[in-house]
Amino acid sequence: HHLVQDRSKSFYQILREPENSVDAVVVGDSLSYTSISPMELWKEYGMTSFVCGQSGQTTQETYYMLKNVFKRQSPGLIIMETHALFKEQSGMNGVKEILGGIGNYYVTLLRNHDIWKAVLAGKRYTRVNYKGFSFRCDVKPYRKGTYMTETEKIELIPSNSEFYMKKIIRLCRKKGAE
């Protein structure tokens, strides 16, 4: 599946790993696949791992990604980057996102809907595999003032994210992962 574009590549790459060879799986948005290095986890802790993060990964995509992971792997540890928990999915956009997440898992054609463009353009994607990790070399400091201040305010998790988070917890418990 070297034609699979960046957003979906970890969905397939994890299935190509030797069965039951991954101790830990990382899920979440771009912060997950640019921040946690499986090579570093191996070097420092002797732990095999794979990053199954996606750009803008939602909680329902995380759930279906984990269902995919558990087809061939039995990781004892799931590391979840939680930015997506607080992403609001409301109105028609929320409905489209929910249906898209379900469709992407069950219908391969939907997941690969843009591969034909790459084939016609003669574009090929590299086969470099860093266990789902992506190097990010364009880091720039934020200079527009304070954006995180400590307060007593509690941010509630949107209901759709909470629904899928509960499903993720049940799935992980069922499969013996923490």
Q: PLM ranges: what are they?
A:
Residues 24-25, 44-51, 144-152:
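Acidic/histidine-rich, surface-exposed loop or edge segments in extracytoplasmic proteins
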Residues 27, 31-111:
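Membrane-embedded segments
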Residues 21-22, 47-48, 74-77, 173-177:
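Loop/turn elements at helix/coil->beta-strand transitions in domains of secreted/extracellular proteins
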Residues 1-6, 35, 133-139:
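Short, compositionally biased "basic patch" segments
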Residues 2-5, 27-28, 54-58, 155-158:
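Short, flexible loop segments at the rims of nucleotide/cofactor-binding pockets, characterized by
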Residues 1-23:
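N-terminal secretory targeting modules
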Residues 91-177:
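Secreted/periplasmic serine-hydrolase-like ester/acetyl group-modifying domain
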Residues 9-12, 64-67, 163-168:
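Alpha-helical scaffolding within the catalytic cores
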